[in-house]
From Swiss-Prot:
Key word Lyase present: no
Protein task: Cell wall formation.
Identification of the protein by name: UDP-N-acetylmuramate--L-alanine ligase
Keywords tagged on the record: ATP-binding, Cell cycle, Cell division, Cell shape, Cell wall biogenesis/degradation, Cytoplasm, Ligase, Nucleotide-binding, Peptidoglycan synthesis
UniProt-annotated binding residues for ATP: 119-125
Pathway annotation from the record: Cell wall biogenesis; peptidoglycan biosynthesis
Species per Swiss-Prot/TrEMBL record: Alkaliphilus metalliredigens (strain QYMF)
Main localization category: cytoplasm
EC number of this enzyme: 6.3.2.8
Annotated InterPro entries: Mur-like_cat_sf, Mur_ligase_C, Mur_ligase_C_dom_sf, Mur_ligase_cen, Mur_ligase_N, MurCDEF_pg_biosynth, UDP-N-AcMur_Ala_ligase_MurC
Length: 460
């Protein structure tokens, strides 16, 4: 149950702990636009804190009890623990507290047509694509995405309509605090096993998310995914299905890939062709993402001709098959893939790209994920010619000594050549010494592996 209801409080001043984060800063910007007095704290200055200060927010660097200056509400991120001095002070003063997901859910309630994009993979790309299709179709949405989107100058754009769109993350069941009119489920996979017990627990969370959609609302469901099919049954809301293999309302046909691996395809709705579509983002996984976007905007009343025209304008987002440059005639591409399914999809996209050899540099993300999916990770790199594994990026976790990157390499080499190199500078030098013109260097992971790509490009 949601502990905080914005409608029950007369709020003027809201304080955000961790205001410099990409999501919290966007929430702060929306609240500022709606006339709230905003204060907040973060551990360091950034472009986001400077931007918020310019918009009128009061920003404190560092966390301290004296930063709590009688706000009506305190909002905190998952990274802010119960022993944070500002949380402690708010509790002492009896000030209501809400976590980031609760606050975002309360904002969603203010919009008649809030859209929440859920799924184990593809959320940021699909949210960005739907956002731009809505924007180009003059629906003027308020947009909050989890990545940098050049077309809106960041990750937040405040519109004046009743449309709102954001990602809906399943981790710690955050999305069960949201209020979508349209919910989208792209796929369901085993992930975040430091919280979820197993796939049944994960499916249960997604089912509860779908049940939050009102009777007059819509679930946009990927019917090629067996788990999504299962949880899409027996819902009160309208269910709109899409797929490539399984009979669905929206289906992609005649899929072809250009010389550079870019897909084009026809789409039918309930058996009738509604248009031909070409993407400027590679990979079959992006055909699925675009089908979700096409179905969503079609439900919103956008003409398929307009969807087809505008979909080609989407060039992708930062850290999603992001072509950063060339060194020694080899293309350097960076991607956020950090799950076995995502690794395979990204390598499949790279394989369709013109190349001699694919050099894959993967940084495992969190010890818990690496341990839980170790065997799946080991089987994910078969499309790469050379595999380099870096040290594990710990994120929120501590190293318990149970799993390490050399252990992953030991499993990979049973099927495919791979090596462990811990240091980023050492990896960059190794790549520079071995790559040739026409090769692809692909850095992958949700941590800071992109720094290797930047180091390599600096070598030239």
């Amino acid at each position: 149950m949601i502990a905080f209801n914005m409608d029950e409080h007369q709020l003027k001043h809201i304080h955000l702990i961790g205001i410099g984060g990409i999501s919290m800063s966007a929430i702060a910007e929306i609240l500022l636009e709606n006339g709230y007095h905003i204060s907040g704290s973060d551990m360091k200055e950034s472009n986001l804190t400077h931007k918020l200060r310019d918009h009128g927010a009061e920003i404190f660097i560092g966390h301290a009890s004296e930063n709590i200056q009688n706000p009506d509400l305190v909002v905190y991120t998952a990274a802010v623990k119960a022993d944070n001095p500002e949380r402690i002070r708010a509790e002492e003063l009896g000030i209501p507290l809400a976590d980031r997901a609760e606050m975002l859910g309360q904002i969603m309630k203010k919009y008649e047509k809030a859209i929440a994009v859920a799924g184990s993979h593809g959320k940021t790309t699909t949210t960005s694509l739907i956002s731009l299709l809505m924007e180009y179709s003059n629906l003027d949405p308020t947009i909050l995405v989890g990545g940098e989107l050049d077309e809106i100058g960041g990750n937040i754009k405040i519109g004046q309509s009743q449309h709102f769109i954001t990602e809906a993350c399943e981790y710690v069941e955050s999305f069960l605090k949201f209020y979508p009119f349209i919910g989208i489920i792209l796929n369901i996979d085993e992930d975040h096993l430091d919280y979820f017990k197993d796939i049944e627990h994960i499916k249960s969370a997604f089912k509860k998310f779908a049940q939050r959609i009102p009777k007059e609302g819509f679930l946009i469901a990927s019917y090629d995914d067996a788990h999504v099919r299962e949880i899409s049954r027996d819902l009160d809301c309208h269910v709109i299905t899409y797929g490539i293999k399984t009979k669905s309302q929206f289906m992609a046909h005649n899929i072809e890939f250009s010389f550079e691996g870019l897909p084009s395809f026809d789409v039918s709705f309930e058996g009738k062709t509604i248009g031909s579509f070409s993407l400027n983002i590679p990979g079959l996984h992006n055909v699925y993402n675009s089908l979700a976007a096409i179905a969503t905007t079609y439900v919103l009343g956008v003409d398929p001709v307009a969807i087809s025209k505008h979909i080609t304008r989407f060039k992708g987002i930062h850290r999603r098959f992001d072509l950063l440059g060339e060194v020694k005639g080899a293309k350097v591409i960076d991607d956020y893939a950090h799950h076995p399914v995502e690794i395979r999809a990204t390598l499949e996209a790279a394989k369709k790209y013109p190349h001699k050899k694919i050099w894959c540099v993967f940084q495992p993300h969190t010890y818990s994920r690496t341990q839980a999916l170790l065997k799946d990770f080991a089987k994910s790199f078969y499309l790469a010619d050379h595999v380099i594994i870096t040290d594990i990026y710990a994120a929120r976790e501590k190293d318990e000594g149970i799993v390490n990157s050399q252990g992953l390499v030991n499993l990979i080499v049973q099927e495919h050549p791979a090596q462990y190199i811990g240091g980023f500078e050492e990896i960059s030098r190794y790549l520079y010494d071995h790559i040739e013109a026409g090769d692809i260097v692909l850095t992958m992971g949700a941590g800071d592996v992109y720094l290797i790509a930047q180091m390599l490009l600096a070598e030239k």
